[in-house]
Amino acid sequence: MDFIVIDGSYLEGGGQIIRTAVSLSALTQKPVKIINIRKKRKNKGLAPQHVSAVKAVKKLCNAEVFGLNVGSEELTFIPSKLSPKDFTIDIGTAGSISLVIQTLLPLSLGINKKFTVKIKGGTDVKRAPPIDYVKNVTLKILRNFGVLTELKVLKRGFYPEGGGEVIFEVKPSKIKKFDLIEHSKSNLVEGISYVQNLDESIARRMRKKAVDLLNKEKLLPNIKIECSKGISTGAGIVLWNDTLGGSCLGEKGLRAEIVAERAVNELLKERESGMALDKYMGDQIIPFLAFGKGIVGVSEITNHTKTNMWVVKHFLDVDFEIKEYKENNCNGFTIEVV
C-alpha cells in the first residue's frame, strides 16, 4: 500500500497538519502517515483535541488507524469509503470544538447524505477560533460558496473545565469557484459580548467600550449581550464585519475594556488591509480553494496558510500562486489556484 508521508514538524508544525491531512485522506481515499507530530512543541505528539478530531473522521470513513493516542508522534490513517452517520464526540477537556469542526468541514464535499454530530468540549479557548467566529465568519463565507452546514451552540465551555456543547450538521455540498478578493466595505459590525458565571455588568462594559471605539471609526455596531450559567467560567467578545472577524477572550485580571479594545483593534487592522479574508480565514479556506479553484484576497500570508497549502499539495494536483495586491487602496495578497 502506498502512503502519503507527511512530516508533522514542517514550518510551525502544529495540529493543523493533522486536521488537514486526515480530512483530505478521507476525502481523496489516500492513506496517510504523519511523522514527527508537533515535534517542536513543549507537549509533543497528539493532544486530546487532535485525537477527538481524528476519531470523528475515522467514524465517518471506517478508517483503520494506528498511533491514535494522546502523546503519539506518529499516526497512520487508512480510510475506507465515506459513510455519513450521526454521533457524539466528547473531547473530554476544554479542547477546542472549533478545531474539530474545522477537521469535519471538508468532508461536506465527499458525502452523499447529511450527518449531525454533537461535540462537547471548549467553545471559547486560547489558540483556536471562538465558536462565534466559526459560526458568523467561517461557515457564512463557505455557505456563500456552496458548503452547506448548520451550527447550534447549546452551551459554552471555557478552560479548564470545558462543558461546551454544540450540534453541527453537515450536508452534501458542491463547492463553487471562488472570487473573493476585496472586502465589501460594509460598515455594519455585528458581535456578541458574553459572560458565563460572571456578572452581566462585565458583558455590558465590553459592549460599551467596543461600541464607543467602533462609533469613532464611523462604523455601525450591533453587539448583543449573552449571560449564561455552566460548569466553566469565562467571558469574551467576538466581532464580525461581513467576512472579517476580531475577538478577545477574557482573562483573570484583564479589564473588560481592554478585552473589548483588543477585539476592536484586531478587526480594524484586518479592515485596514481592504482584503476580503482575515489572516485566520486565509488558512482555513485553503482546502476549499483547492477544490473550488479561483482566487481569494487575504490580509497576510501566515505560516498556518503556507503549511495548509503544503499539506493540500500532497493530496491534490494543485498549485497556489501568491501575489501582492495593492489595488483600490488595499494592502494584502491574493491566493489563486493555478
UniProtKB/Swiss-Prot annotation:
An annotated GO cellular component: cytoplasm
PANTHER family linked: RNA 3' TERMINAL PHOSPHATE CYCLASE, RNA 3'-TERMINAL PHOSPHATE CYCLASE
Active-site residue list: H304 (tele-amp-histidine intermediate)
Similarity section: Belongs to the RNA 3'-terminal cyclase family. Type 1 subfamily.
Function: Catalyzes the conversion of 3'-phosphate to a 2',3'-cyclic phosphodiester at the end of RNA. The mechanism of action of the enzyme occurs in 3 steps: (A) adenylation of the enzyme by ATP; (B) transfer of adenylate to an RNA-N3'P to produce RNA-N3'PP5'A; (C) and attack of the adjacent 2'-hydroxyl on the 3'-phosphorus in the diester linkage to produce the cyclic end product. The biological role of this enzyme is unknown but it is likely to function in some aspects of cellular RNA processing.
One term of GO molecular function: ATP binding
Gene3D superfamilies hit by this protein: RNA 3'-terminal phosphate cyclase domain, RNA 3'-terminal phosphate cyclase, insert domain
Any one of the GO BP annotations: RNA processing
Binding site for ATP: Q102, Y280, M281, G282, D283, Q284
Enzyme class: ligase
Principal location class: cytoplasm
Name of the molecule in the record: RNA 3'-terminal phosphate cyclase
EC identifiers of the protein: 6.5.1.4
Keywords, ordered alphabetically: ATP-binding, Cytoplasm, Ligase, Nucleotide-binding
Database matches in InterPro entries: RNA3'-term_phos_cycl_insert, RNA3'_phos_cyclase_dom, RNA3'_phos_cyclase_dom_sf, RNA3'_term_phos_cyc, RNA3'_term_phos_cyc_type_1, RNA3'_term_phos_cycl-like_CS, RNA3'P_cycl/enolpyr_Trfase_a/b, RPTC_insert
Gene (name only): rtcA
One protein family per Pfam: RTC_insert
Reaction(s) catalysed (UniProt annotation): a 3'-end 3'-phospho-ribonucleotide-RNA + ATP = a 3'-end 2',3'-cyclophospho-ribonucleotide-RNA + AMP + diphosphate
